[in-house]
Amino acid sequence: MADDTLTHKIIGYAYKVHKAFGTGFLEKIYENALRIELEKAGICVRQQQPIKVCYDGQVIGDYFADLCVGEDLIIEIKAVQALVKEHEAQLVNYLTATGVNNALLINFGPSVQVKRKFREYRPKGSLMNAILSPGP
């Protein structure tokens, strides 16, 4: 499990970013600002982390996680009126594809919404593998 203290810090930085920008900006603006806050805090973060999804030894698709903190936490950023189940499903897919167990879904809508997802189960012998490519 990702460190709860770290998770609380990240959520605090999300509120700081939302306070600075309010609502209405593109997702990328909030993503960039949150990355800057995490870097200023000395937190190891990678932006737009490629995730290659493999099946039977072949790459069958790519995802890009907005932010990855260390090897333990994926952060997906949204800037929508309200989160919907499809946003949560996207995050669960990232967890399934990578084998990472913890993720945050942060929405910079009219108010900050945060959903924390845990995935502690990965089927043994699963045919799906993911390669977290090193960032640039």
Task: Annotate each PLM feature.
Residues V59-I60, E86:
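Short secondary-structure boundary/capping elements
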Residues G22, V45, A65-L83, Y94:
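Conserved catalytic cores of phosphodiester-cleaving nucleases, focusing on short active-site segments
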Residues E39-G57:
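A short acidic/basic microdomain associated with nuclease active sites
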Residues Q49, Y63, P110:
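Short beta-strand or tight-loop elements
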